[in-house]
Amino acid sequence: MRTNFFIFLCFLLNCCSKSGSPAPPAPPPPPPPPVVPVVSWNFETSPVWQDEFDVDGAPDATHWNFEVGGNGWGNNELEYYTNNNNATVQGGTLHITARIENIGSSQYSSARMITKGRGDWLYGRFEIRARIPGGRGTWPAIWLLNSGNVYGGWPKSGEIDIMEHVGFDPNNIHFTVHNQSYYGANGKGSNKIIATAIDSFHVYRCDWTPAGIRGFIDGVQYFEYANPGTGTNAWPYDQPFFMILNVAVGGNWGGAMGVDNSVFPATMDVDYVRVYKWVD
């Protein structure tokens, strides 16, 4: 009898214990799917901003300013960028020239032209017809940076390299985007071999919409970076950007194979820069 009572008591206690146990927590809901805008890739046919470089002399100050200095520019570059001494317009063409010249601790001079405050754009088509220099140690570029660094210093606020070329790899043109998720050697990019890259003019183009960024040479697409819809770490390209034209000397990439002084002066020639508004 006592044994049966004890078994019964244990049964009651077990039931009470089970009935009082909290239910296991529900699994967390799945993350929402990425939100990627569905938009057109249409652009106006007339430029909203352009420079045809049809007036000889200094570059148009209503369109361009200069970044000046010789601090390596975050890439251990060797040149000192001057205030228009290395950039002139002649015969319908802009000439940005890197040359051997001692300025401060730098042994080279060049120019770095920017449109900031004179041309800042959110989305659009950017078209530049240019001929780039070759030779070991040259590093010409056509690129865009965030006008306000809204998300923080590089690479958080983004960079779009419409054209980059390093002289030790003469026929190879690069298009790359950098952001907090992908930057430096891990930037999202593509390259295209152009046999006449340093001998002839080519049209370098970037199409930029809320859905993505595309890169072209002479009308042929060779790069695309789609907006992943995961936030500003991978898509800081929802703010105005400005354009940069420059010819660097040496640096982490441009100088990876050294600098050949026999190639200087080295000039990037620009026939025109045209910006077209994106049509939503």
Can you annotate each of these PLM segments?
Residues 32-280:
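GH16 jelly-roll
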Residues 2-8:
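Sec-dependent signal peptide recognition
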Residues 2, 13-44:
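Bacterial Sec-dependent N-terminal signal peptides
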